[in-house]
């Protein structure tokens, strides 16, 4: 099942969820950002469920530009800075597992 198909199933019945072109753009965006985060050229199948979660969140925030909270009694808006931040532990675990499997250690100079 493709990433787009997973997202379409999760968003089934939601308004504007039938716009495959918009969903594909969001799938591509999520895929690229996750690949950059984990330093892999392609999205591993193991991380596709996370990518689907990210796309659903991006879709639901499309019209809100990443608003995390709003107050009704006063005008107050907080924006989400990094939608992938909540998955950092999973990404780190993936990278560690890949390093262990390959037997290579990565040294980074600051």
Regions found by a protein language model. Name each.
Residues 57-110:
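Short loop/turn elements at secondary-structure junctions
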Residues 28-35, 52, 56-60, 64:
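Amphipathic alpha-helical core segments of compact helical bundles
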């Amino acid at each position: 099942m493709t990433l787009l198909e997973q997202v379409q199933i999760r968003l089934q019945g939601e308004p504007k969820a039938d716009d495959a072109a918009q969903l594909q753009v969001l799938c591509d965006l999520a895929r690229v950002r996750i690949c950059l985060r984990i330093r892999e050229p392609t999205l591993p199948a193991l991380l596709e469920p996370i990518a689907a979660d990210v796309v659903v969140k991006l879709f639901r925030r499309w019209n809100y530009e990443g608003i995390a909270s709003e107050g009704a009694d006063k005008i107050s808006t907080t924006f989400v800075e990094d939608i992938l931040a909540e998955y950092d532990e999973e990404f780190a675990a993936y990278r560690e597992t890949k390093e262990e499997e390959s037997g290579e250690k990565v040294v980074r100079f600051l």
